[in-house]
From Swiss-Prot:
Regions crossing the membrane: none
InterPro entries attached to this UniProt entry: 6-PGluconate_DH-like_C_sf, 6PGD_dom2, G3P_DH_NAD-dep, G3P_DH_NAD-dep_C, G3P_DH_NAD-dep_N, NAD(P)-bd_dom_sf
Pfam families: NAD_Gly3P_dh_C, NAD_Gly3P_dh_N
Gene Ontology CC terms: cytosol
Name of the featured protein: Glycerol-3-phosphate dehydrogenase [NAD(P)+]
Molecular-function annotations in GO: glycerol-3-phosphate dehydrogenase [NAD(P)+] activity; NAD binding
Protein family (similarity comment): Belongs to the NAD-dependent glycerol-3-phosphate dehydrogenase family.
Organism whose genome encodes this protein: Aeromonas salmonicida (strain A449)
Lipid biosynthesis among keywords: yes
Gene3D superfamilies in UniProt: N-(1-d-carboxylethyl)-l-norvaline Dehydrogenase, domain 2, NAD(P)-binding Rossmann-like Domain
Domain of life where this protein originates: Bacteria
Length: 334
């Protein structure tokens, strides 16, 4: 495998910028694409992402562009870091410019809006069956990754050699450890469900329920994640790894998590719209909650925590009433 592999990162938000910074530091020719020319011009002028990562300058050789055709054709590996609700749209825009050797990965954590389908199914609908696909997932906050603090993630792919290639691209012995995992479905699912549970953890803390309640919610949330995974053929061990337990604990316990902060605001009595506006960035868990609800219903899987969060967000249920509904469920074996 060549030491250097060109890669284009599609999505110049906080996480896309952090991944591009890490890849460029690793010595790989890296191009960061953003959809808004004015924003990209600002990034180029400042040579940092002032909005999200103001203390981390871009490496000198990190290139930027708002030209999607240039980004797609500049590298054989594309890494999508875009919100889940525009994932299919971006793939459709990318498709006309694909190279014969293109491989596509994503760091997006979520499901298809209005259907709850896995992003792999969206990608196959748009791109067909031949292009190698991969997903990276795990406990990563953009600020810490960009700052070079120790971080570990997992990568899964439809093609083992592509998983190995991404591991080579991302892995940095000083700070960034990358595990490969054969469970393509499990890695996608873990990233979506943990966003929902993180909102629940924030709600619990916002209501003042304390550490006992938060820990119980995380633990039973993991059970719901495993239950849905089993229905979709995922490996239960995946949910005890980086993309499951790791990401779940991170986003449920640290206030860098937008989903947790969103839940905290709701628990403090703020309306959904107000809480979203205060975050000021995409809260993936809001949409993920509806998507997981749809997927669980389609699979016939019981997910009581996710269901109560859905009712709070989309049906106006009082958060305290949702907590009571969970605690008053019939007794059962663990």
């Amino acid at each position: 495998m060549a030491d250097q592999i060109a890669i284009s990162v599609l999505g110049a938000g906080s996480y896309g910028s952090a991944l591009a910074i890490s890849l460029a530091r690793n010595g790989h020719p890296t191009l960061l694409w953003g959809h808004d020319p004015a924003h990209v011009a600002e990034l180029e002028h400042d040579r940092c992402n002032k909005a999200f990562l103001p203390d981390v300058p871009f490496p000198a050789d990190l290139q930027l562009t708002a030209d999607l055709q240039r980004a797609v054709q500049a590298a054989p590996v594309l890494l999508l870091v875009v919100p889940s609700h525009v994932f299919g749209q971006v793939l459709s825009q990318v498709k006309p410019f694909l190279r014969p050797d293109t491989r596509i990965a994503w760091a997006t954590k979520g499901l298809e809006p209005d259907s709850g389908r896995l992003l792999q199914d969206v990608a196959r609908d748009v791109l067909g069956e031949t292009i190698p696909l991969a997903v990276i997932s795990g406990p990563t906050f953009a600020k810490e990754l960009a700052a070079g603090l120790p971080t570990a993630i997992s990568v899964a792919s439809t093609h083992d050699d592509f998983a190995d290639e991404l591991s080579h691209l991302l892995h940095c012995g000083r700070s960034f450890r990358v595990y490969t995992n054969p469970d393509f479905v499990g890695l996608q699912l873990g990233g979506a469900v943990k966003n929902v549970i993180a909102i629940g953890a924030g709600l619990s803390d916002g209501l003042g329920f304390g550490a006992n309640a938060r820990t119980a919610l995380i633990t039973r949330g993991l059970v719901e994640m495993q239950r849905l995974g089993a229905a979709l053929g995922a490996d239960a061990k995946t949910f005890m790894g980086m993309a499951g337990l790791g990401d779940l604990v991170l986003t449920c316990t640290d206030n860098q998590s937008r989903n947790r902060r969103f839940g905290l605001a709701l628990g403090a009595g703020k309306a959904v719209e107000t809480a979203m506006a205060e975050i000021g960035q995409v809260v993936e868990g809001y949409r993920n909650t509806k998507e997981v609800h749809l997927l669980a219903a389609r699979c016939g899987v019981e997910m009581p925590i996710c269901e109560q969060i859905f009712q709070v967000l989309y049906q106006g249920k009082n958060p305290k009433e949702a907590a009571i509904a969970l605690l008053s469920r019939d007794k059962r074996d663990e």
